Amino acid sequence: MASLLQGLSASPGSGLPINQDLLLMQKGMLMRKVRSKSWKKLRYYRLQDDGMTVWHARQAGGRAKPSFSISDVETVRGGHESELLRNLAEEFPLEQGFTIVFHGRRSNLDLVANSVEEAQVWMQGLQLLVDFVTNMDQQERLDQWLSDWFQRGDKNQDGRMSFGEVQRLLHLMNVEMDQEHAFQLFQTADTSQSGTLEGEEFVEFYKSLTKRAEVQELFENFSSDGQKLTLLEFVDFLQEEQKEGERASDLALELIDRHEPSDSGKLRHVLSLDGFLSYLCSKDGDIFNPTCLPIYQDMTQPLNHYFINSSHNTYLVGDQLCGQSSVEGYIRALKRGCRCVEVDIWDGPNGEPVVYHGHTLTSRIPFKDVVAAIAQYAFQTSDYPVILSLENHCSWEQQEMIAHHLTEILGEQLLSTTLDGQLPTQLPSPEELRRKILVKGKKLRTLEEDLEEEEEEPEESELEGEQEAELELEAQFESEPQELSPRSKDKKKKVKAILCPALSALVVYLKAVSFYSFAHSREHYRFYEISSFSEAKAKSLIKESGNEFVQHNTWQLSRVYPGGLRTDSSNYNPQEFWNAGCQMVAMNMQTAGLEMDLCDGLFRQNAGCGYVLKPDFLRDAQSSFHPERPISPSKAQTLLIQVISGQQLPKVDDSKEGSIVDPLVRVEIFGVRPDTARQETSYVENNGFNPYWGQTLCFRVLVPELALLRFVVKDYDWKSRNDFVGQYTLPWNCMQQGYRHIHLLSKDGISLHPASIFVHICIREGIEGVES
């Protein structure tokens, strides 16, 4: 068992060659940690010998504490990409600064080195380690995980572990074990009889801890000799249990080649118990169907036929009143596959518009910085179109600057006219709009008028009259959502701000209009117009006119946004709006929790491209579907989930050394109202390492096409609310049957490898007599 650095600096074939940057990082360097213009402090940073963690101290030789793990790092950026470091460019050369970007919602770490050379050492060294960790295979990740635990358990850092150190480590690893049994395993692993465990001996000790009786029993059920699975036996398992069907024979050969550790086993086309376990724990044995991982849906249908991953107040990385506005909000949203971002624009100093949450204490960022970030990151995760939802509060002059920045910075990426210059009859498809950025906002004229032959420019007074007739800035109809009626519109105070023609012209397929009624929309609106709904208004429409809302969303786009009282940036449940076919259900992406788990779960499929094709009954203009009262269709199904066991569940609170989790598993179904249900297992006392439940849960689902499953592991507490341990959410239609592992994620959606739960999934057609 080698540490990462040993792997990096060893002989060829063991990883990366010896690297001077990493050796210098191990010696440590004094750098300046920057949080704001007023908070800049010297810290001594050092890469630990394990090659996986960076510690810091106030000075060289001072008391050090962990700063971050390499596995937590997503990427490293140069100083010129940090808005904070750019603001300090007069104080520190940008070339000496760099930013460490973490997975999830953890704040970036901005550092300034003493020289350009030292900054390069850390930037290059860190990125080298990040790339190495990212490309680790399943076994390498497990080896590194074991190495991390060995480092934590080896208190005196002498490279060996006494039985006392092993006992402490077992508590850290969530293992409650009889001392006599633990000592017996310890002695068996101590082949050198030194009274301590060294690297490979510790690995053997770990293997004895992690023997999976339930997997061995399953293996022996299909193995004639209990030692191996022949090719035919493995094919039987894949067909009978894993429901792999006709492809089982070819798949069996692939899986043996991929997972059987012995070369002789591969040659004989047999699978050992170790190979069988490797298969079950790998992506091949995952609950998420691999056929749903790439782009597998039809991407040539009109935009309104898709659910679109959408963000609310994208610029905020905190709450709605005092939170920080940052281009980082856009970068994070786009990199996680978001395809619709919101830009709230106000007049700024020196003629430059700014982005912030108006009439609040949130900080302000230049609009041009936001556009530059969007230009850079729009298509790093997905090639499919990005929608800029503009909330325009600016004067005529600064609107011209908005149009200028959009045109100049986005260039060819910006869609400024219809695709072929002709009047379309429906919205274009994501495929047709690849790598294009669309503007959603108010528009002075219709698309038909825009596409007419060149006419004499209208007088400004005509524009103002036209504006008064039809324009209300988006801010007005979003802050006072669609309780308007055509009559009450006249009583409403007019907004006299004039929309700049240059900005209006950039709105092509997504003209924002106020919603009055479904009948009004059918009579007066066109397919390229889009209405926004507050969550309260959308809920009311679903309840009162659910089928009309579904039909409305078959020909026009709808955007739903969180209510104004959510000042803490909390989220609503997006599922009820997806049930009505609403395409753009905007989420506060900076806030983790159940609601974002559902959003991440839906958009996990289709390569995470941000577009998911709606079910056929949400695309049919004559659909009779009502999300509140779905008639039981022929596609109704019954789900049987046997929750078998858990593996290496993390501690809820690392500060409580003696505490061990009492895990239970809750399975939740989200979909149409009759399908929404939850059930949970009993809890297992004092065992987060390898708990066993062996309990079966049963659900009936009327509309599986809309259902999401969320698996949650909780730490039972009889005195208070159960603590969250981990979760995983996926669409019903992406679930694989059979014996599957569910690899858990943190609240922030980060892998908790190797934490997982082992289940058996069985789906039966039709409704069986079960209560859920």
From Swiss-Prot:
Positions of the UniProt region annotated as Disordered: 448-470
Residues the entry annotates as binding Ca(2+) 5: D715, Y716, D717
Subcellular location: Membrane; Nucleus; Cytoplasm; Endoplasmic reticulum
Domain C2: 619-746
Domain PI-PLC Y-box: 503-619
Cofactor: Ca(2+)
UniProt domain PI-PLC X-box: residue ranges: 297-442
Taxonomic source organism: Sus scrofa (Pig)
Membrane topology: Peripheral membrane protein
Keyword flag tRNA-binding: no
Residues given in the record as substrate binding sites: K440, K442, S532, R559
Protein name: 1-phosphatidylinositol 4,5-bisphosphate phosphodiesterase delta-4
